[in-house]
A protein has these predicted regions:
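Rhodanese-like catalytic fold shared by cysteine-dependent sulfurtransferases
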Residues: 1-39, 48-51, 61, 65-94, ...
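Structural scaffold elements adjacent to functional motifs in cytosolic proteins
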Residues: 55-57
């Protein structure tokens, strides 16, 4: 142990870099696990949509009009928080949220889960992942 302390004393830059890298890896892994708990691949979202899931688009009205998942409703993250009473009838149904890249969807699905929505999910990768799979969009 004494030799390890001596080594770090002589190689402070190397030791600091190792500690920073360990922290970066820990944060990355933590975020990955947190996102994957309630994140679904596009094919899984299609399956839930076929079972009658409620789909919520978190993007702007303009982006929504440019193309969205079939049957999706447009709501902002703030509207979801305020609309908990309106969405209450969907608490037991699958509910999928998405945005352009999946980042806002993670937060929204967590907020919904905290409000008692037991089947709230995020589209992993957002609309970008949906498009990458060449899945259809509805315009208007």
């Amino acid at each position: 142990m004494d030799r390890l302390i001596e080594y770090f004393g002589h190689h402070m830059t190397l030791a600091s870099a190792a500690i920073v890298m360990a922290g970066v890896v820990a944060v990355y892994e933590f975020r990955n696990r947190a996102q994957s708990e309630a994140a679904l691949a596009p094919q899984d979202v299609v399956r839930l949509m076929n079972q009658g899931a409620l789909v919520i688009d978190l993007r702007t009205q303009e982006a929504f009009a440019g193309g969205h998942l079939n049957g999706a409703r447009q709501m902002t993250g703030e509207q979801i928080l305020k609309a908990a009473e309106t969405l209450k009838k969907y608490k037991e149904k699958p509910l999928v949220v998405y945005d352009d890249n999946g980042s806002a969807g993670v937060s929204a699905s967590r907020q919904l889960a905290a409000q008692g929505f037991t089947k709230a999910f995020n589209l992993r990768g957002g609309l970008a992942a949906w498009r990458a799979e060449n899945l259809p969009l509805t315009k208007g």
